[in-house]
């Protein structure tokens, strides 16, 4: 509530004993709870309908919500300029509980997705007699098949089942399958377990991205999405550090090789995170029963998303699919994510690991540790692009700039016969690829915010289609038996072509299409009103 409004309320409630509470709010006293201020302003409404409106919409906050898009503050700001202290407190709670669990869950997801590569390079290949076949590629393939099947349906389920039950349940289920891999002796056993890991992991990225979009404003999303995805980068990096440490200190303990211990430790790390999510994940604003949110904060959370044009979830019927498949967003963003997947950017850390192993110049701990530098570049790029895209209020220019960097790195991969140190530097620089995921996810949340079911389905469909197209592409162009140069299959030149297509589509195509469709929507609205 603004200062003048609170002063009027204070004057009107002097006889009701509410002045101390409202006066404290005027001073910006953060110790006054939202419930107290809400109760005070509600008391005003007993004799004044105008005050009732004021109390319902501006209690403990500013009367005008921060506008979506960029503000006038500095480049690096966590809250939009003009955000009230009470709303900042709400956002802090969301960051502390919602965002923290999201990051931890995605950390485990990426840890579990990358562990098989670290295990493969740390003795699993030799102990189980893998190679010169494509066992590692097939492990990736079965994982992707599971994600293709699981992601869209998981994200539709999350619109009717409380996320705080669904997401931790999926986390525990896929972690149980990860644990099972420590007993595997054949490639077929790995394939089965990797399929089920992918099936339940498919709920993580689209489900959490959907839930974040239910709580945060459009102008807040890119920064949070970037932090969320960066946690996955840390998961990839930590997998290398953990495998290196286990190889040094646990190899042979309990009769188990170090690569088997990796799967056991990954499961142990997942258990407390799943329990944390069960008790602290806040569901969605219209359904939340989070113990750490007071009544005013729950109302404010609903008001925040309503002001962004987002509606409560409707019933799930055929009309939902009609809305989805007649929209431009489903095709534009699914194509964008498919092109990103076909760059095989998410596998470059794996190929870097195999490259280091092929040189025969590095120890097992070094082979696991050095590729994490790629993750560090990924981390910094996500943070930077998140802030920049929020500041300028556009995703296209950022995608175009990052795409130009990727065109350079993939050109070096295509040439290949370059000095060893240059090739290593290019592998590391290629870490910029990862920022596309939060940029595209934030873009979807921005464009589809008014229709939560469409938004949820598109996020899931992006994951599934991305996995579907990369399965045959990875098998044909990037078989592990041809790693790391992939000369016979022309892997790197093929990926370069998709990098160029990705850069043009996300940097130029989607922004032009978005502007055209928004103008058309305004014309249709004007004609309808006429």
From Swiss-Prot:
Gene3D superfamilies: MFS general substrate transporter like domains
Membrane-spanning residues: 165-182, 195-215, 226-246, 261-281, 324-344, 369-389, 396-416, 422-442, 456-476, 493-513
Annotated family: Belongs to the major facilitator superfamily. Allantoate permease family.
PANTHER family assigned: PERMEASE-RELATED, TRANSPORTER LIZ1_SEO1, PUTATIVE (AFU_ORTHOLOGUE AFUA_3G00980)-RELATED
GO biological process, alphabetically ordered: melanin biosynthetic process
SUPFAM superfamilies: MFS general substrate transporter
Annotated organism of origin: Pestalotiopsis fici (strain W106-1 / CGMCC3.15140)
Stored Pfam families: MFS_1
Bias-annotated ranges (Low complexity): 59-69
GO cellular component terms, semicolon-separated: plasma membrane
Protein's cellular compartments: Cell membrane
Superkingdom to which the source organism belongs: Eukaryota
Disruption phenotype: Does not affect the production of scytalone.
Function summary: MFS transporter; part of the gene cluster that mediates the biosynthesis of dihydroxynaphthalene (DHN)-melanin, a bluish-green pigment forming a dark layer in the conidial wall that protects the conidia from UV radiations.
Residue span of region Disordered: 41-76
GO molecular function, one term: transmembrane transporter activity
Membrane-related topology note: Multi-pass membrane protein
Keywords carried by this UniProt record: Cell membrane, Melanin biosynthesis, Membrane, Transmembrane, Transmembrane helix, Transport
Name recorded for this polypeptide: MFS transporter PfmaC
Composition-biased stretches (Polar residues): 42-56
